UniProtKB/Swiss-Prot annotation:
Species, as recorded: Rhizobium meliloti (strain 1021)
Residues binding NAD(+): D198, E199, S206, A244, G445
This protein's name: Sarcosine oxidase subunit alpha
Any GO CC annotation of this UniProt entry: cytoplasm
Predominant localisation class: cytoplasm
Gene: soxA
UniProt cross-references to Pfam families, sorted A to Z: Fer2_4, GCV_T, GCV_T_C, Pyr_redox_2, SO_alpha_A3
InterPro entries for this protein: 2Fe-2S-bd_N (IPR042204), FAD/NAD-bd_sf (IPR036188), FAD/NAD-binding_dom (IPR023753), GCST_C (IPR013977), GCV_T_N (IPR006222), GcvT/YgfZ/DmdA (IPR028896), GcvT/YgfZ_C (IPR029043), Sarcosine_oxidase_asu (IPR006277)
Length: 987
């Protein structure tokens, strides 16, 4: 045999050659190959380097559990790191690059880490870098973080499209192997709505690499004919290249379809990936079983692979992974592989069986070594020999590949996503799905059923029962005849091999070896969840699909208990990695949504503004000046200037709604929880709008400009939502009211003039008297400007705590008025300021935004309980606001927070803990909603929502951020840090 590609075997199309590159080297594959099979066909054993020790790694599996063959595929914005070569279909022009090596895959300087392996055992980072402590953030952590990771994500924008879809069915079949195909066919013929999903490119699963015959057909032909019949049924949808990744409440399943991941240039009218949310009446988990690796010295060497993988490459892809392989087995499947290799012309050197006798009658040419184990391997970048221990001695046998068959573990991850725990079966030597799963059944290999005929029969029987439960007539289930079936699996768990000299790996991707597990148990981390985190076993991108059960078995062996007593870690979505693009769907970029710019955008840009995106709006964030090195310097200057002189801020982005009609006042009285019916003309009032459930929806001011005309402002982010809410109330709840609504946000340019000198500046362009006596706080009216040349609306409201006004003028005049105000205030120190400064000013004054109004807050939580009108017969949210849970004394309440040491700071999102309390969920007292450095106070200040906070002013607490590793002693206080008597508002 001159090539690793066999002359006749496999499902690949030998008439369609495909060119691809690996690390820049040109290679050839065939239509139907995966990248992994094409690399093996080219004799490429070394495909990657391990995470920690940078050991040479080869292809281990033929499917989704692959921990070693992770590559980067594509270029530019389409470059995708950590792609499993075993799942990546080959296409013309595919470019793949190995990862986690420098300067090259063959010569990786990182392999020197192997010399340091005695110091890099389990939990080494907890023990090694204790002193000197100051070097942790400056040296140790940066070095570890740079060394961590595998592939590198692209910095370029993703050019492709993604989408989301919903689907509903009577029966969702997950897995299109023999069990899944039989189930889907039975239910489909009965008329049930069926969705069949499978992560492979072809339906069939293990049938595609099986040499058995079913009803006289080759297994692969049976799979093809069955899938063709399913596709012809109008009530059946077959989704290939689709991975079901999660099981959620309501029997909703998440799945991601790789629509165009198998082509070089995706068609522009199709998504690259599609996220499916499938609502199933019933679901059948037919995902099969994953072969279990064996833990022996050098089991990670390139050329060592799972027996099932070797069988797949042989029978499905027509590739012999080696010319002189050996097989190390604990069950009968190793003999099936040996027979198929020999039938393909491959010389099997030896079968090493850990048992005294096999369950099948093997009559091949390979040497049988019973009651023996492989205790080690030899070779550099590929395996060259195995060390076999038997009869009290160790023998070296030359090989160029080794298949290991350590038993099977049912793939039951999805069955455990809703809290169920796997159950250990001593009979099956495997963990099984929990019983009594509502809405989900498990069958076939996923239920530890063995034998092809048994899996086909079980799939059909389960589907028949589900169909009858749905009330549909079910025709008699056809009994298929299976010939040349694989031998019965006789499980004999072999957790570890005695006499190991080289590293024996449990978790291949994270370089967790046998000694790491033993060390964790000896050091007290014997609970499976602790051992997982201490060793990082099961925490790589494969989430322990191959390593978890071996790790549990080794922990059980070290503790002298059964795997049932050790238990398992918690299974959570996602089953395999899911791209952010698929989760985001079409919500990327701007699409047809407009970029919204305020009427003062160009004016702000002319004055050097730095902009920030707020929804669709671009808001001026701050205005840097020459010599200022950081944004904070600019913001502090602007804050101090507003407090000392005056500032001009663009607030045009606030939502503006005009409400008119003879019932406008009554309408507002019903949508706000506080009173608006008797608001005088010429006055503004702060209002709280509730949802039906009693929680605050939005806040803002509404001014009565005329008897039946009101001017409402909303928050920027909720402007559209508030408009929709008001229209719903007017059209559905109270259609009898005479009220009209108009969104006028874009018709007005609005600017805030704040600071002690605001009045003298504004008076220069406003014709009317705006003294405190003539125009007091919360006054509102239409005014004339420049001797009647222009009219606008003036509101005496303040978000800064200073004497302040908001002036609204027709949008087209915005820039001219802003220039006029700067000119009028040039002798008074006026400066433009942005939203960052506005945020500091409002935190100093204790004003809230949607950081505090987070959807779970009621008026009393913010200290606005007395605002709620008790005398009104009704308003939106009134009934639900009176619920017991919303009036409890220990609800979160708005407080201020200051650090005990003014030199320390804390972040928004940090948790509040009682002094001396441990950082646990039970001890969580609340969290920081907004924080900023206050030039007025001289330290960081914050607003927070804290349990029973108003009665805890003066209490010392700990502000803790586990994400950043920060703990700051602090004190709770009044949320109003500036002018608590409001004297500056009323000057």
């Amino acid at each position: 045999m001159s090539s690793y590609r066999l002359p006749k075997r496999g499902l690949v199309d030998r008439n369609v050659p495909l060119s691809f590159t690996f690390d820049g080297r040109p290679m050839q594959g065939l239509e139907g190959d995966t990248l992994a099979s094409a690399l093996l066909a080219n004799g490429r054993m070394l495909v990657g380097r391990s995470f920690k020790y940078h050991r040479p790694r080869g292809i281990l599996t033929a499917g989704a559990a692959e921990p070693n063959a992770l590559v980067t595929v594509g270029r530019g914005g389409r470059a995708e790191p950590n792609t499993r070569a075993t799942m990546q279909e080959l296409y013309e022009g595919l470019e793949a690059r190995s990862q986690n090596r420098w300067p090259s895959l063959a010569f990786d300087i990182g392999a020197l880490n192997g010399l340091l392996s005695p110091f890099l055992g389990a939990g080494f980072y907890y023990k090694t870098f204790m002193w000197p402590a100051p070097l942790w953030e400056k040296l140790y952590e940066p070095v570890i973080r740079r060394a961590a990771g595998l592939g590198k994500a692209s910095y370029e924008a993703d050019p492709d499209a993604y989408e989301k879809s919903w689907a509903h069915c009577d029966l969702l079949v997950i897995g299109a192997g023999p069990t899944g195909l039989a189930a889907a066919l039975t239910a489909g013929r009965a008329g049930a709505r069926v969705i069949l999903v499978d992560e492979g490119s072809l339906p069939g699963g293990s049938l595609l690499s099986d040499t058995a015959t079913i009803d006289g057909k080759a297994a692969a032909d049976f799979a093809r004919d069955t899938s063709d019949e399913l596709r012809s049924m109008p009530n059946v949808q077959v989704l290939v290249r689709t991975t079901a990744f999660g099981w959620y409440d309501g029997n909703v399943f998440g799945a991601v379809e790789r629509v165009q991941k198998h082509v070089r240039e995706p068609a522009s009218h199709l998504p690259v990936e599609r996220l499916w949310r499938i609502v199933a009446g019933k679901a059948l988990l037919a995902t099969g079983a994953e072969e279990r690796p064996l833990v022996f010295g050098g089991n990670d060497r390139p050329g060592v692979m799972m027996a099932g993988a070797m069988r797949a490459y042989l029978n499905r892809y027509g590739v012999a992974p080696g010319r002189t392989p050996a097989i190390f087995t604990t069950n009968d499947t190793g003999y099936t592989l040996a027979q198929e290799l020999e039938a393909a012309g491959v010389d099997v050197v030896a079968i090493v069986d850990s048992r005294p006798a096999a369950g099948v009658d093997y009559r091949g040419k390979a040497r049988l070594v019973r009651e023996a184990v492989v205790c080690g391997t030899k070779g550099g970048k590929a395996i060259s020999a195995i060390e076999v221990h038997h009869g009290g001695r160790t023998e070296t046998i030359a090989v160029d590949a080794l298949a290991m068959a350590g038993g099977f573990d049912p793939i039951i991850h999805l069955a455990c996503h809703r809290g169920g725990k796997p159950v250990w079966s001593a009979e099956k030597a495997a963990f099984l799905a929990p019983g009594s799963l509502k809405g989900l059944e498990v069958a076939g290999g996923a239920a530890a059923t063995t034998g092809l005929a048994a899996c086909l029969g079980e799939g059909a029987a389960r589907a028949e029962a589900i169909v009858r439960e749905l009330g549909l007539p079910c025709p008699p289930v056809a009994v298929v005849k299976v010939e040349s079936e694989e031998g019965i699996r006789s499980p004999a768990p072999l957790w570890s091999i005695p006499g190991i000299k080289d590293k024996a790996f449990v978790d291949f991707q994270n370089d967790v070896h046998l000694k790491d597990i033993g060390l964790a148990v000896r050091e007290g981390y014997s609970h499976v969840e602790l051992a997982k985190r201490y060793t990082t076993s099961g925490m790589a991108t494969d989430q322990g699909k191959l390593s978890n059960v071996n790790a549990i078995g080794l922990i059980a062996k070290a503790r002298g208990v059964s795997p049932a007593e050790v238990g398992t870690t918690t299974f959570r979505p996602f089953y395999t990695p899911v791209s952010f693009g698929a989760l985001t769907g079409a919500h990327t970029g701007h699409h047809f949504q407009p970029v919204r710019k305020s009427p003062l955008h160009d004016w702000a840009k002319k004055h050097g503004a730095v902009f920030v995106e707020t929804g669709l709006w671009y808001r001026s964030s701050w205005f840097p000046r020459s010599g200022e090195r950081t944004w904070r310097e600019s913001v502090e200057r602007e804050v101090l200037n507003v407090r000392k002189n005056a500032g001009l801020c663009d607030v045009s982005m606030l939502g503006k709604i005009e409400i008119t009609g003879s019932d406008a006042a009554e309408f507002l009285n019903r949508v706000y929880c506080n009173a608006f019916l008797k608001l005088p003309v010429g006055k503004a009032r702060y209002g709280l709008m509730l949802r039906e459930d009693g929680f605050i929806y939005d806040d803002g001011t509404t001014s009565r400009l005329e008897e039946n005309r009101f001017f409402m402002t909303t928050t920027t982010a909720y402007a559209a939502g508030v408009m929709n809410h008001l229209e719903f109330c007017a059209q559905v709840l109270w259609p009898q009211l005479d009220v009209r609504l108009a969104s006028i946000t874009d018709q007005w340019a609005q600017m805030a003039i704040a600071g002690p000198k605001a009045r003298m500046i504004l008076q220069k362009i406003v014709d009317e008297d705006i003294s405190d006596a003539a125009f007091p706080f919360l006054a509102a009216k239409e005014v004339s400007l420049f001797g009647g040349a222009l009219h606008g609306c003036l509101f005496r409201i303040s978000f800064s705590g200073e004497l302040a006004y908001e002036l609204a003028v027709p949008a087209g005049y915005g820039e001219s008025i802003a220039d006029a105000l700067l000119e009028a205030g040039k002798d008074h120190g006026i400066m433009p300021y942005g939203v960052e400064t506005l945020s500091v000013l409002r935190i100093e004054k204790g004003h809230v935004t949607h950081n505090e109004i987070n959807g779970t807050i009621v008026p009393a939580d913010l200290g606005f309980g007395k605002m709620v009108s008790a005398g009104k017969p009704d308003f939106v949210g009134k009934a639900m606001l009176q619920r017991e849970g919303l009036t409890a004394p220990d609800r979160p309440q708005l407080v201020g927070v200051v650090p005990l040491d003014p030199q320390q700071s804390f972040r928004s999102g940090s948790h509040i803990l009682a002094k001396g309390a441990a950082a646990t969920l039970e001890n969580d007292e609340g969290y920081v909603t907004s924080s900023a450095y206050s030039p007025h106070v001289g330290s960081t200040i914050a607003l927070a929502l804290v349990r029973n906070g108003r009665n805890r002013h003066g209490e010392e607490v700990l502000v803790w951020s586990g994400l950043h590793g920060e703990s700051t002693p602090a004190r709770l206080c009044n949320p109003v840090f500036f002018d608590p008597q409001n004297e500056r508002l009323h000057v």
